[in-house]
């Protein structure tokens, strides 16, 4: 009786390590598969970081001269103290983003401020229309503000923005048929390689500028000259916002890809440690089986 019980116990003892070994081998295969996948992802994120760094360096070089355009055009509104009369109802919001992602909260921060601005204007009884520069803004706001979109510009962010791109946006706006009284352009202003700030700058229609009290002192300003300047200043401000937004986006993407690469390195280290421990456990169990088998034969 005792011999049969001993044989049964020995059989149970010898079967259990085989199941454990199979389980550990499956775990090793899973870990190896995950390691390979994460290493491939890390290669991609490192490559994207290098590309973003090169684009960021170029964008930063081009930003300084571009700021002159925007600051100069905005100075007219500030110095002339141009304001929209309270009875004017039509307001335009231009949101600047791009078509590309993997850059943190760059696009969502602009969309968030646009939502807040649109809600405040609607509460004040204003008619609001939206222009989206970049497909990301459209995709974020389409569900909640689709009826307010006037026009959307795509193919933004694939190459550095130029003054010609800003002129096309300004021309489409002026030819859209929407006679706005006042507007605002929302974009991310570049501060440093790790910092940006979502800002809002004003834009005004030709009627608002020409009817401003401070402009009435210039009797020799022709209407065509004022219209040309208004169109040119609008293109300048759009160009300035495009350059600021592009530089902020590339720096944010570079930072995001750097963080992703670091996270991948941490995951690789942890999985490598787990792989080594699991493999060592498998080897130890196999050695125990060999020694136990040799001892049983003796």
Curated annotation (Swiss-Prot):
Give the record's subunit note. Answer: Component of the ATP synthase complex composed at least of ATP5F1A/subunit alpha, ATP5F1B/subunit beta, ATP5MC1/subunit c (homooctomer), MT-ATP6/subunit a, MT-ATP8/subunit 8, ATP5ME/subunit e, ATP5MF/subunit f, ATP5MG/subunit g, ATP5MK/subunit k, ATP5MJ/subunit j, ATP5F1C/subunit gamma, ATP5F1D/subunit delta, ATP5F1E/subunit epsilon, ATP5PF/subunit F6, ATP5PB/subunit b, ATP5PD/subunit d, ATP5PO/subunit OSCP.
Q: Which residues carry this modification: N6-succinyllysine?
A: 49, 115, 154, 270
Q: Which GO terms describe its molecular function?
A: proton-transporting ATP synthase activity, rotational mechanism
Determine if Isomerase is one of this entry's keywords. Answer: no
**Could you read off the lineage of the organism from its UniProt record?**
Eukaryota, Metazoa, Chordata, Craniata, Vertebrata
Q: Which GO terms describe its biological process?
A: proton motive force-driven ATP synthesis; proton motive force-driven mitochondrial ATP synthesis
Q: Which NCBIfam families match?
A: ATPsyn_F1gamma (TIGR01146)
State what protein this is by name: ATP synthase F(1) complex subunit gamma, mitochondrial
Organism this protein belongs to: Bos taurus (Bovine)
**One GO cellular component, as annotated:** proton-transporting ATP synthase complex
Give the UniProt keywords, A-Z. Answer: Acetylation, ATP synthesis, CF(1), Hydrogen ion transport, Ion transport, Membrane, Mitochondrion, Mitochondrion inner membrane, Phosphoprotein, Transit peptide, Transport
Subcellular location(s) per record: Mitochondrion inner membrane
Q: What PANTHER family does the record tag this protein with?
A: ATP SYNTHASE GAMMA CHAIN, ATP SYNTHASE SUBUNIT GAMMA, MITOCHONDRIAL
- Give residue numbers for the modification (Phosphoserine): 146
Task: List every position bearing N6-acetyllysine.
Answer: 39, 55, 115, 154, 197
